């Protein structure tokens, strides 16, 4: 029978950090829990390696005037502000270089602290209206001009995460409901309230209230509430018919009845164009055709003149040719010989 090797006992979880040290140094994966912590490197050694310095004691230490001046001087270097200008979204590597440069000057600040410090100085410079100038205003103004931060402060956008409760939308207030800020405003009764105030019904309903004798039966359905469309449509209007139903008979107008209001009747359809308008349009088209045919007529006249010239030249050429032929024939027959011979 094979014996399985015994498993080592589980390691105890690391103890929580004490309040005295708010920012403990993180351990590397290779360090054992029982080994003593490594000795922190000096700022000069970290500066030589090009690594940012992130001491725990510098997290809550306020910035001094010397540190602020060194930070602004480092940011004003051409290599630094050009790197920030070229890549604003990935500015953390550049601020690491800034932190390493400050570490060489015995200023122990993290890249995030350098970034927040410049943002704080920039915001304070924008908000300083009508106040005496500060010691670093000239450097901040120059750095903002180089980085293109002369605009107004942009609001910070926060997307609602899983840990933050989302705000519910406020309900849309009723148009007829009184504002809650008014002290004399009274709540309006609902549509289903049977003990509604008759004065409110008389004031806000479009039709006068009915008497108690004309109340509907208990089993009958409630009457539909009047709408704006129903008030615009006259009561004697014919009901809507389907597409297959025959047209309604024409209604006869009573000569004694007063004429209807212009807003009750539908607008008349657009009249077809008159004969004069059609004739004017036709004449306009004919004028366009005449304008097109005019240049063609001039070209035909020019061609006719050329043809007449060619015909005259052809007749003259034929006459010369005939005379030449007849003269040659007479010379051959001796007709033109001397009569003295």
UniProtKB/Swiss-Prot annotation:
Provide the record's note on post-translational modification.
Phosphorylated.
Localization, UniProt? Nucleus
Outcome of residue 296 to P? Abolishes coactivation activity
Q: Which Gene3D superfamilies match?
A: Homeodomain-like
From which domain of life does this come?
Eukaryota
Record region (Disordered): 1-62, 146-273
InterPro entries membership = Myb_DNA-bind_4
Keyword annotations: Activator, Nucleus, Phosphoprotein, Transcription, Transcription regulation
Q: What is the effect of changing residue 303 to P?
A: Abolishes coactivation activity
Could you tell me where the Pro residues compositional bias lies?
8-23, 257-272
User: Any S-S bridges, and between which cysteines?
Assistant: none
**What Gene Ontology molecular-function terms does this entry list?**
transcription coactivator activity
Q: Which residues carry this modification: Phosphoserine?
A: 18, 21, 54
* Keyword Transcription applies: yes
Spell out the residue ranges making up region: Leucine-zipper. Answer: 279-310
Query: What cellular-component terms does GO give this entry?
Result: nucleus
The UniProt entry lists the main location of this chain as nucleus
A GO BP term, please?
A: regulation of transcription by RNA polymerase II
The free-text domain note is: The leucine-zipper domain is required for coactivation activity. When this domain is deleted, the protein is able to stimulate transcription from a number of gene promoters.
- Function field: Acts as a transcriptional coactivator of ATF2.
Which proteins does it associate with, and in what oligomeric form?
Binds to the N-terminal region of ATF2. Associates with the TFIID complex through interaction with TBP.
**What is this protein's name?**
Undifferentiated embryonic cell transcription factor 1
């Amino acid at each position: 029978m094979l014996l399985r090797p015994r498993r080592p006992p589980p390691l105890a979880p690391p103890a929580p950090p004490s309040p005295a040290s708010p920012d403990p140094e993180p351990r590397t994966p290779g360090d054992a829990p029982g080994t003593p912590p490594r000795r922190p490197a000096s700022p000069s050694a970290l500066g030589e390696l090009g690594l940012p310095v992130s001491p725990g004691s510098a997290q809550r230490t306020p910035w001094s005037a010397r540190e602020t001046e060194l930070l602004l001087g480092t940011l004003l270097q051409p290599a630094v502000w050009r790197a920030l200008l070229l890549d604003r979204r990935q500015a953390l590597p550049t601020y690491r270089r800034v932190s390493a440069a400050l570490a060489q000057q015995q200023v122990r600040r993290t890249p995030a602290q350098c970034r927040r410090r410049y943002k704080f100085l920039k915001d304070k410079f924008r908000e300083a209206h009508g106040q005496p100038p500060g010691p670093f205003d000239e450097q901040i103004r120059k750095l903002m001009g180089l980085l293109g931060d002369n605009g107004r402060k942009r609001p910070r956008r926060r997307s609602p995460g899983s840990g933050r409760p989302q705000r519910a939308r406020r309900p849309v207030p009723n148009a007829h409901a009184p504002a809650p800020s008014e002290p004399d405003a009274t709540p309006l009764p609902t549509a289903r309230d049977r003990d509604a105030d008759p004065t409110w019904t008389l004031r806000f309903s479009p039709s006068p209230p009915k008497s108690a004798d004309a109340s509907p039966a208990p089993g009958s359905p409630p009457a539909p509430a009047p709408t704006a469309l129903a008030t615009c449509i006259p009561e004697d209007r014919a009901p809507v018919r389907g597409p297959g139903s025959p047209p309604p008979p024409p209604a006869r107008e009573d000569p004694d009845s007063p004429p209807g209001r212009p807003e009750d009747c539908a607008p008349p359809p657009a009249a077809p164009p008159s004969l004069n308008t059609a004739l004017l349009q036709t004449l306009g088209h004919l004028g366009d055709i005449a304008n097109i045919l005019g240049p063609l007529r001039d070209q035909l006249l020019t061609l006719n003149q050329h043809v007449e010239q060619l015909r005259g030249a052809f007749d003259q050429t034929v006459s010369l040719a005939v005379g030449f032929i007849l003269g040659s024939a007479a010379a051959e027959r001796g007709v033109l010989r001397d009569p003295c011979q």
